[in-house]
Every structure is written in C-alpha cells, then in structure tokens.
Amino acid sequence: LEHLDIDLPVGFVHLPCAGCDVKFNFSNFRRQVIHIGWWLRNFDSFFRLKTKYKKIVLQGPDKYAHHPYFLKNINLKTRHVQNRTHFENYLSNFNYDEIMSKSVVFLDLYDSIANNVIVECICRQTPILVNPLDSVIEYLGKDYPFYYYSLDEAAEKLEDDDLIKETSEYLQSRQRLISETKFINDLGYVLDEFT
C-alpha cells in the first residue's frame, strides 16, 4: 500500500499449523514426489519434471477434484510422453500424514499468499521443492535449500539425498514461526496496535 501512497495500518501474522506428530523421516522415504492443491499451481511443470521418482497428484476433496480449473490442468498430463503420474483420491488425515512423511512435495506456484501446503510442509518437516516467491520466502526464509529456478535444477535437487535430509532439518528450525502460540501472541500484538 505504501507504493500507492495509501496510509493505512496493516497487521501481519503468519498462518499457524496445529502440531503434527508424524514427521518426514528419510529412512522411510519412498522416492516419490507429490503435488498438492490446485489454486495458482502450474501443473504442467509437475508433469514435465524429469525424475525416476513416482509422481503423485493428490486430488483433494470432491469439490475441487471436479473444479473446471483442476480438470483442465489434469488433462495436461496426456501431452507428456512416458509420464508416470498417478492420481490419489482424497486422503484421510492419517493417510495424508503418512504420505507427507514419506514423500517430497513439488509446487510451481504462479502466486501465493499464505499457502497451506507450505505451512503443512514446515509442520511435518517435509521437503518441498518450490519456486521462491516473496510470500513463500516469508515462510521458508531466504536460505531455504530446496528453492529451484528451473525444472532441471528441481530434478537435480530431487536426486540429492544429502540435500533432502538438510532441507528436512532446516524445516524443523522454521516450526516456531507457525506455532499456534506465536500466532496468538502476534495477533494480540496486532490487535493492541490498532485499538
């Protein structure tokens, strides 16, 4: 708003995540990469990602698995030769936690604000290959090791076991940022500032 010369106070808090006991564990890693969600995602990048890993698109609840935007983008899969992408229907919370603890996530975002998948990956220490948008950097930090700038770089990072372990450990250091306690304290601070 500053660049528009609008003098309006704005408060900021990070989206919190309720704790999750199931964390990514490299010893259980199944060499699979998953795509989660559909809003402002570039599905084509996921389908074009060159990897030996099993690729899985989590379709989510019925209401968005049948959304025209989602369906149009899922049809992009057929344009790519030898695409080993599998589709999973909506998962229970238990099964979602399980797949997150044994996989790496890949997203190519057109834009984002407070992205649930980013927060869920921090909470579970699940490495997420993601393009470094400003709003993503607010959550993952500028030194996050699993940012990519091209699909070739993403594919290369996906094959680096040490980097995957390092990324999971790095995400542990970001968990305080999304804690419920921090959210409540920050929200209280923001409300005090505007009252």
Model-predicted segments: where are they?
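Acidic donor-binding loop of glycosyltransferase active sites
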Residues: E98-I113, T126
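Short alpha-helical segment that forms part of, or immediately flanks, the ligand-binding pocket
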Residues: D97, N115-C123, D134-I137
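Short glycine-rich donor-binding/catalytic loop of glycosyltransferases
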Residues: D111, T126, V130-L140
